C-alpha cells in the first residue's frame, strides 16, 4: 500500500530541478526532451510531456528520438534556440555533454535511475542511485513520476497519478525488481486503470494472447516486446509516430487492408499498435536469418569448445539486434554468450553479453568485471553492454576456459515444490494459478516438479504443424510442451507401451467456451524408465 512509498524529498536535487523547469515554462522558453531508446525511455518522456501540457498547455516543447539505440543526448542535434534540455531515463554520465550545454547557456535536467560513478557538476541530476533514496529498483519513469509529484505540490494540483499506467509499464519493461515494495505498489496501482490510449490499443491487439488479463506477465511478454521491437527495428518515422501515439496525438495514418484497394485513415494509436505487431514479426524474421549465419560460424570455428561463446558479429548482425540474438544463442547452447562488433571511433570492441539463467553463472555482468579484462560491463546482471580491447579477447577466452573447465553447461532447475505422484491434483494446479497477478519482476512463477507419473505412450498426442508439441492428460491435468526436440519425442514414443515420467513445469489454466481446465506448461521432462506390468 501507499505506506511503502517514499517521499519525493528524499531525491537529491529534485526541488532545484522543478524550480528550473518552472522558470523556463513561465518565461515561455523552448524545452527539448531527449527520448531514450527503450520502453522505459518512451514512457518516461511521454509522462513528462503530457504532464507539462496539462500544467502549461501552450508550452514550447520539442522532442528527439535517437536514430539507433543510442542513449543520452546528442548535443549537435539540439536547436540553437533551446533554453532547457531534459533527459529522462538516461544522461547521468554524459559529463562532457553537460559541460558543453552549460557553456552554451543551456540548462540541463537529468531524470535517471542508472548507476553513475559521480554527480555531474554541470547539470541538475535527479537519480535514485546517487543519493539516499531507499528504493534503488525504480526505473526512469518512476523518477519522472516523483518529479511530477513535486510539481503537483508546487502548483496545488493532482495530475501525477493520472500517469501511473506509464509508471507501471515502464518499470515492468525495464525489468525492475518488484520485490521492492514501493515499485510493486506503483506497478499494481498503475495496472488497475490503464489510461494511455496507445497502451489500450496494444492490449486490444494482443487480447487473444493475454486472454484479456492485464498483469505484470501480460505487459512483460505481450506489450513490452512490441514497443522494444519498434524502437529497435522500426524506421525513424515509425518511432516518431509511436511516440505521438504515446502522447495522445489525434492524427491519423493511411491504411489499406490486405486484398482491398481503398485506403482508409486509421487513428494513430490503432495504426501504431498494428504496425508494432508487424515490425516485431519483421524483426524476428531478420533475427532468425542472422542466427543461421552466426550458427554456421560457430560450427566452422568450433566455438562450442569454449565455455563462453564469444563471437565477432561485426559484418553479420545489425547492432540493434545484438542483444536479442545473444539471448537466443544463450538459450540454445545453454551457456553465456558475448557478441562483439568493432567500434572504429573508440578503437575497441563493444557488444552485448547475455547469461544463461538455468546455468551456474547467475550474474554474467559481475563475472565479466571480475576478470579485469573488460573496459566496462553496464546493465543488468544477466544482460549487459560490454567493451573490450582486441588484445584482451583471446586472453579472456583462455581465462574463462580454464576457470570453467570443470563446468558442464546443462539445464539446472531450482524448483519450488517436488510433488510425488500422490500429491498431484487438479486443485493444486488451479490453486497456484490463482496467484498469477503476483508473478514477475523478481517474484518468479513457481516451478513445480511432478514426479512418478505413469503414462501410456499411446495417450501422448504429438501435435502441431511441425509435430513438435506433446500433450497428455494425468488426473484431469493437461501437460503440454511446445518445441520439443526430436530425441525427446522419440524418448517417449519408442520406450515401451508405458513409461514413468518426471515433469518440471508451471501451473496454468485454459479457458475455452466457459470450460476451465488445469494445465501444466512443461519446461522439461525426463522419462525415467519403461514400466511393464504382468497381469
Model segments located where?
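A residue-level signal for conserved active-site and pocket-lining positions in enzyme catalytic cores
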Residues: 86, 228, 432-433, 505
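A contiguous loop/helix-start segment that scaffolds small-molecule binding in enzyme catalytic cores
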Residues: 191-201, 403-491
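OB-fold/S1-family single-stranded nucleic acid-binding modules
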Residues: 513-534
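Short nucleic-acid-contacting surface segments enriched for D/E, G, S/T with interspersed K/R
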Residues: 486-504
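OB-fold and OB-like beta-barrel modules that bind single-stranded nucleic acids
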Residues: 378, 432, 498-511
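Residue-level recognition of well-ordered beta-strand positions that form the cores
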Residues: 226, 473, 504-508, 521-523
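Conserved phosphate-handling catalytic cores of large alpha/beta enzymes
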Residues: 77-78, 85-102, 106-168, 176
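Hydrophobic helix-and-loop "lid/oligomerization" segment in the mid-to-C-terminal part
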Residues: 1-84, 103-104, 152-398, 412, ...
Amino acid at each position: 500500500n501507499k505506506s511503502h512509498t517514499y517521499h519525493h524529498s528524499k531525491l537529491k536535487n529534485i526541488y532545484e530541478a522543478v524550480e528550473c523547469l518552472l522558470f523556463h515554462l513561465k518565461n515561455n522558453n523552448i524545452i527539448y526532451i531527449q527520448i531514450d531508446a527503450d520502453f522505459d525511455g518512451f514512457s518516461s518522456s511521454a509522462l513528462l510531456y503530457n504532464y507539462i501540457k496539462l500544467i502549461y498547455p501552450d508550452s514550447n516543447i520539442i522532442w528527439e528520438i535517437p536514430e539507433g539505440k543510442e542513449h543520452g543526448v546528442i548535443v549537435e542535434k539540439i536547436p540553437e534556440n533551446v533554453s532547457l534540455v531534459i533527459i529522462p531515463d538516461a544522461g547521468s554520465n554524459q559529463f562532457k555533454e553537460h559541460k558543453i550545454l552549460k557553456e552554451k547557456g543551456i540548462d540541463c535536467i537529468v531524470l535517471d535511475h542508472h548507476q553513475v560513478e559521480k554527480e555531474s557538476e554541470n547539470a541538475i541530476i535527479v537519480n535514485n542511485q546517487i543519493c539516499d533514496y531507499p528504493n534503488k529498483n525504480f526505473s526512469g519513469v518512476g523518477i519522472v513520476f516523483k518529479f511530477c509529484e513535486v510539481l503537483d505540490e508546487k502548483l496545488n494540483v493532482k495530475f501525477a497519478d493520472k500517469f501511473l499506467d506509464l509508471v507501471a509499464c515502464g518499470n515492468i519493461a525495464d525489468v525492475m525488481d518488484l520485490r521492492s515494495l514501493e515499485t510493486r505498489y506503483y506497478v499494481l496501482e498503475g495496472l488497475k486503470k490503464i489510461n494511455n490510449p496507445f497502451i489500450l490499443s496494444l492490449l486490444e491487439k494482443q487480447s487473444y494472447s493475454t486472454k484479456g488479463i492485464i498483469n505484470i506477465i501480460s505487459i512483460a511478454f505481450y506489450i513490452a516486446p512490441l514497443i522494444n521491437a519498434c524502437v529497435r527495428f522500426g524506421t525513424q518515422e515509425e518511432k516518431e509516430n509511436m511516440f505521438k501515439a504515446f502522447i495522445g496525438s489525434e492524427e491519423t495514418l493511411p491504411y489499406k487492408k490486405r486484398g482491398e484497394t481503398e485506403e482508409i485513415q486509421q487513428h494513430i494509436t490503432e495504426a501504431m499498435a498494428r504496425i508494432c505487431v508487424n515490425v516485431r514479426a519483421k524483426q524476428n524474421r531478420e533475427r532468425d536469418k542472422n542466427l543461421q549465419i552466426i550458427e554456421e560460424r560457430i560450427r566452422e570455428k568450433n566455438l562450442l569448445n569454449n565455455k563462453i561463446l564469444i563471437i565477432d558479429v561485426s559484418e553479420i548482425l545489425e547492432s540493434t539486434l545484438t542483444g536479442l540474438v545473444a539471448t537466443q544463442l544463450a538459450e540454445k547452447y545453454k551457456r553465456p554468450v558475448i557478441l562483439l562488433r568493432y567500434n572504429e571511433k573508440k578503437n575497441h570492441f563493444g557488444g552485448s553479453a547475455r547469461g544463461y539463467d538455468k546455468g551456474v553463472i547467475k550474474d554474467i555482468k559481475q563475472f565479466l568485471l571480475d576478470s579485469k579484462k573488460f573496459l566496462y560491463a553496464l546493465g543488468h546482471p544477466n544482460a549487459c553492454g560490454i567493451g573490450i580491447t582486441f588484445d584482451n579477447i583471446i586472453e579472456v577466452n583462455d581465462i574463462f576456459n580454464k576457470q570453467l573447465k570443470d563446468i558442464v553447461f546443462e539445464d539446472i532447475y531450482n524448483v519450488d515444490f517436488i510433488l510425488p505422484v500422490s500429491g498431484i491434483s487438479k486443485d493444486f494446479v488451479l490453486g497456484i494459478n490463482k496467484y498469477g497477478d503476483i508473478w514477475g519482476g523478481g517474484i518468479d512463477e513457481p516451478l513445480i516438479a511432478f514426479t512418478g507419473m505413469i503414462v501410456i505412450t499411446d495417450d501422448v498426442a504429438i501435435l502441431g504443424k511441425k509435430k513438435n508439441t506433446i500433450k497428455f492428460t494425468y488426473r484431469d491435468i493437461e501437460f503440454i510442451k511446445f518445441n520439443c526436440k526430436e530425441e525427446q519425442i522419440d524418448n517417449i514414443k519408442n520406450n515401451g507401451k508405458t513409461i514413468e515420467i518426471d515433469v518440471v513445469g508451471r501451473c496454468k489454466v485454459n479457458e475455452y467456451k466457459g470450460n476451465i481446465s488445469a494445465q501444466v506448461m512443461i519446461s522439461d521432462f525426463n522419462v525415467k524408465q519403461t514400466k511393464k506390468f504382468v497381469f
